[in-house]
Curated annotation (Swiss-Prot):
Protein name (Swiss-Prot/TrEMBL): Lysine--tRNA ligase
Organism the protein comes from: Cupriavidus metallidurans (strain ATCC 43123 / DSM 2839 / NBRC 102507 / CH34)
Chief localisation class: cytoplasm
A GO CC term attached to the entry: cytosol
Originating gene: lysS
Cofactors demanded by this protein: Mg(2+)
Length: 515
């Protein structure tokens, strides 16, 4: 059987190409059947001694004379990405988890039977080799193969090497193929792992204990969001996938664990957008005897170090614009940000709830009769105007501080500004990256705020919070002054990897069903 041509291996985009792919798959199934009959279809007795990346790192500058004088024996395996058959000698480019390396395969070295079989192996097959390192006449570090085996037969052809997966949705839906053919995708997810590892080190060095709290909650809480609902059969009770771990983490502060953090999934039954995925990763941390000012300094340093560890520099480029994370982050109030980016608004207008309600309705076409606006006060209206006029302009790292109490039901109130809380949100490239505040530890104040949230929910606001009586009971045992913050890991990784869509940094994002 002949080797599939590059055109045959392309991603099918027409009926004709689909037929070609089906033909290729049928041919490969015939090859697999022959391997089964020989009893060698999927061997599992090969142990590699090296990876491609490590070989290039260690021997990338070693010349041929040195390799001949001190032979380097290697056993290596990977996916065959390129293949050139030339009479009695052939080349194959093999890719493992660390990179690519070239195999040099000759009939004299591997034997006539193996060499004949190799000619019928396909791109995408997993193969292994034992041999010695050498340099080709062109100077490329390669493996002079002595033993060659087929470990796993690929039945489906890879996309064309020059075009890869052209359709973005296919990249998300078939991430396994995207990872095979796209070095950029592999780099993105390695950077994600490095960023999370950096965060864990940073937290451990600061004395934080990593914990795990429930994913199934009897009462959803810790954020203003619509939950996913499920049913616990054994307990015969309705449960909610967690929207945030906040209230459980603060219970641990009450219990005496004074510095805790968790990196885990949250679930919110809401829309999908370039910034939102219903299942996403958050890091939340809480520290006793701190406040929101301490949190801002700590978060700034943590993000800066994550950039250095994941990308090698505190300076990153996002969508063609450079960001220097080594500089101090800006700080603005909500009204200060509005007047910076929409200077036409006066102090008097920003203090006039009737004006703001009319402005949001008439200029920004917002339905101010919606349930979440029924009892909206000045603070809520200011926040919505900020979101419409300023949020997208916050490209440089900027803390927006001093949020209204009515939109911050879990945050401690300011000692000097009535109606304001000690809360911040961090924006970078116009996106919220973090949200933190000095925690409200007054159980009576917290209970009253929960009651107001219940009123909002009863009025039709699906994102308003429930009343959590057990959390109030925990606060009644006494919680020390505490600061807490949540950081969106996915959005942070978007920033560090120059990814425009949150689905670019989630291995298997949610998509509509295939027809």
């Amino acid at each position: 059987m002949t080797e599939p041509t590059r055109a045959q291996a392309a991603t099918p985009t027409t009926e004709g190409l689909a037929v070609d792919e089906n033909k290729i798959i049928a041919e490969r199934r015939e090859k697999l059947q022959a391997l089964r009959q020989q009893g060698v279809a999927f061997p599992n007795d090969f142990q590699p001694t090296h990876q491609a990346g490590a070989l290039h790192a260690q021997y990338g500058e070693t010349d041929q004379a040195t390799l001949e004088a001190s032979p380097v024996e290697v056993s290596i395996a990977g996916r065959m990405m390129l293949k050139r058959v030339m009479g009695k000698a052939s080349f194959a480019t093999v890719q493992d988890g660390s990179g690519q390396i070239q195999f040099y395969i000759t009939r004299d070295k591997v034997g006539e039977d193996v060499y004949a079989a190799f000619k019928h192996w396909d791109l995408g097959d997993i193969i292994s080799a034992r041999g010695e390192l050498f340099r080709t006449n062109k100077g490329e570090l390669s493996v002079q193969v002595r033993e060659l085996r087929l470990l796993s037969k690929a039945l489906r052809p890879l996309p064309d090497k020059f075009h890869g997966l052209a359709d973005q949705e296919t990249k998300y839906r078939q991430r396994y193929v995207d990872l095979i053919v796209s070095p950029e995708t592999r780099s993105t997810f390695r950077a994600r792992t490095q960023a999370i590892s950096s965060i864990r080190r940073h937290m451990a060095d600061a004395g934080f204990m990593e914990v795990e709290t429930p994913m199934l909650h009897p009462i959803p809480g810790g954020a203003a969001a619509k939950p996913f609902i499920t049913h616990h059969n054994a307990l015969d009770m309705q449960m909610f996938m967690r929207i945030a771990p906040e209230l459980y983490l603060k219970r641990l502060i009450v219990g005496g664990f004074e510095r805790v953090f968790e990196i885990n999934r949250n679930f919110r039954n809401e829309g999908v957008s370039p910034r939102h995925n219903p299942e996403f990763t958050m890091m939340e941390f809480y520290a006793a005897y701190t406040d929101y000012r301490w949190l801002m300094d700590f978060t700034e340093n943590l993000i800066r170090q994550a950039a250095i560890d994941a990308r090698g520099s505190a300076t990153v480029t996002y969508q063609g614009r450079e960001l220097d994370l080594s500089k101090p982050f800006h700080r603005l109030t909500i009204c200060g940000a509005i007047q910076k980016y929409a200077p036409e608004y006066t102090d008097a207008q920003l203090a006039d709830a009737d004006f703001l309600r009319a402005e949001l309705k008439n200029k920004f076409k917002i339905n101010t009769s919606a349930p979440q606006f029924l009892n909206a006060g000045l603070g809520t209206l200011q926040l919505v105007l900020f979101e419409e006029t300023a949020e997208a302009q916050l490209w440089e790292p900027t803390y927006i501080v001093d949020y209204p109490v009515e939109v911050s039901p879990l945050a401690r109130g300011s000692d000097t500004q009535p109606g304001i809380t000690e809360r911040f949100e961090l924006f970078i490239t116009g996106r919220e990256i973090a949200n933190g505040f000095s925690e409200l530890n007054d159980p009576e104040d917290q209970a009253e705020r929960f009651r107001k949230q219940v009123e909002q929910k009863d009025a039709g606001d699906e994102e308003a919070m429930y009343f959590d009586a057990d959390y109030i009971r925990a606060l009644e045992y006494g919680m020390p002054p505490t600061g807490g913050c949540g950081i969106g890991i996915d959005r942070l990784v978007m920033l560090l990897t120059d990814s425009p869509n949150i689905r670019d940094v989630i291995l298997f994002p949610h998509l509509r069903r295939e027809d």
